Amino acid sequence: MDRAVEFFKKKVNDAAEEKEILQIKIVGDYDADGMNASAILYDAIISYLKANSLAEYAEVSVRLPRRYSEGYGLSKKIIDESESGLIITVDNGIAAIDAIKKAKDKGIDVIILDHHLSGEELPCADIIVDPHCEGMSTFKHYCGAGLAYRFAEMLITNKDLLDKLLVLAGIATVADVVPLIGANRYLVRQSLKLINRGIATSGVLALVRKMRLEKITAEDYGYKIGPVCNASGRLLDDGAMDIFHLLSQELDVFTLDYDEQLLKLHALADTVIERNVDRRRITEEALERSDALISQQCLADDAVYIIYDTQVSEGVMGIVAGKLAEKYMRPVIVFAHAQDGEKLKGSGRTYGNIHLKNQVLDPCKEYFFAYGGHAGAAGMTIPEKNLMLFRNKVRKLDIPVLYREKRILYDLEVTKEEIPELYEKMEFFAPFGEGNPEPVFFIRNLELSPVRGKFYEQNGSDGKSIKLFTMPYPSSGYQMAAEYLLMDAPKKIDMTFEVYTIYSHGKEHRRLRMLDFCASKNAETETSFKKGLSAMLNFM
C-alpha cells in the first residue's frame, strides 16, 4: 500500500511542478462496498489536496459503472472517457486486463485497489494492491472499502476525517460479507464505537436519523444500512451515484446555505430508503412467483433449480436466488431477460457444500456467453436458446440431492435462568458476521406466559411471523406463525435461538430470535375445553 500512496503523491506533485492539472478518476462499483470505498478515496484525496495546497493542480471525479447498460468493473468505455491522468480502481480492476491495457496505451496511469481473486494473468497497471496476490499482504480478507481506508490512513493525517471514513469502511466490511476476523474485526468494532458517538459523514448521519436507528450494531450494518446502500444500484442503471453522493457528503455548518444543503441531504436519504422498500416489494413478488414457476418449468425433482422468470429485475436476481436456495435447500440459478433483450442474465447461489462454479457452471461452459463466480455465488449470460440445453446438462451431472431435513446445530444448552447473563457475554464476542457467527443456544421446556390474555401474537405485514410471550424475554420467529399454529400452539416448547436487542425510544428491549422449535415432549396435554378457552383468550 505504501507504494500506491507514494505513486499517487508523486503524480500530483509532478503535475504541480509542471503547472498542469492532473485528472484523477476513481472507478468503483455499484454495490455497498464499491460505493463506500469510492466515498473514502474521494474524501481522503480532496482532503490531501487541500491540506497540501495542491487543489488547483488536480480534478477529482468518481465513476461508478452503470449496472444495466455497462455491467461490473472497469470497461473500455470508461477508459474512452479519459485522455490522460490517473485512474484508481477500487473494489474492481484485477480482472480488467483489456481495459487497463487500453489505458496504458493511451498514457493513463492506473492504480488498482481490489480484493477479488486474480486470474492467471495480472493487468499491466502501474500499482496493484490486492491481498490475494502473492506477497501483497499477510491479511487476505479486506473488502474494497477496507483497502481504501488503509490508503486514506497513509495519505492524510486529519484524524476527524479518518474517523468518519472508518465508519464507511465498517459498513462496507459487514455489507460485503467478508470474514469479521483480524483487521476486519478491529475496523468494525471501532466503526460502531464512532457511529454510536455521532461520528460519521453528514450523509451517513442523515441516513441513520431517517432510518430511526438508535444504538447501531453490526446487524444494522448488514441488514438495514447495507441493503439501503445496495438498493439504488440494484433498481436503477446509475442509482449507485446517489449513494456515493450521500455517503461522501460532509456539510459545513458555517456556510450560508447549510440549512438548504441539510434539507437536500435528508431528502436524498428519504429517496434511497424508499428505493429499498421498492426493492423488498419486488423481491417478495419474485419469491411468490417461484412456486408456480418451479411447477410450470418441471423443476421439482432437480438437484439444481434453474428458474426463468420473465418479470424479475436483474438487480434482485441474486437476492431471490439466495432466498430460494435456503427455502428449497438446493442450489438455485435465476435467469431474466437482459435489458438489451438479446440474451438472458443469471445469478446463482448455492446450498450446502456444492461448489457452484466448479460443479455446476464449469461443466456447462460451452452454453454461456460469459460466466464467473466461486463456490457460493455466480453470475452468467446465456443465449435464450441455450437455457434448456443448460438445464438438461445439469440434470445429467453428478450433483447430490442434499438431505432435505433441516438441522440446526447449537453451541450451548441453557436454562431460563441463564438467559439474562448471555447478553452481557455477547458484548465481548461481538461484532458477529461472516467468520464469527452468533452463538446458537438450545433450551428445553420453555413456557409461554400470557400477556393481556394472549400467549402469542402474529406480526409482520402478512401476519406470517410470530411473537411468543416466553420468559424472561419474548421470542420472535420470522415466517414461523403457520408452523406454530399447525402444532396447535403449544404452551411449552424446545427451541434453538439467538439473543438480540432492540433499541427504541431510548429503551432496550431484549428478544430471543427463534431458529427452530417443537412442542416439548413432556408438555401437559390440554383438554379440548382448555384448548378452546386458550384460543379464545388469544384472539380477544
What label would you give each PLM region?
Residues 68-70, 134-137, 416-417:
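A short acidic, often aromatic-flanked loop/helix-cap motif at beta-alpha or helix-coil junctions
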Residues 30, 34, 92, 137-141, ...:
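Alpha-helix N-cap/helix-initiation motif
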Residues 77-80, 87-104, 108-178, 187:
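Conserved phosphate-handling catalytic cores of large alpha/beta enzymes
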Residues 20, 182, 186, 261-308, ...:
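Mid-to-C-terminal polyanion-binding domains and interfaces
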Residues 66-68, 116, 132-134, 338, ...:
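Short, solvent-exposed coil/turn elements at secondary-structure transition points
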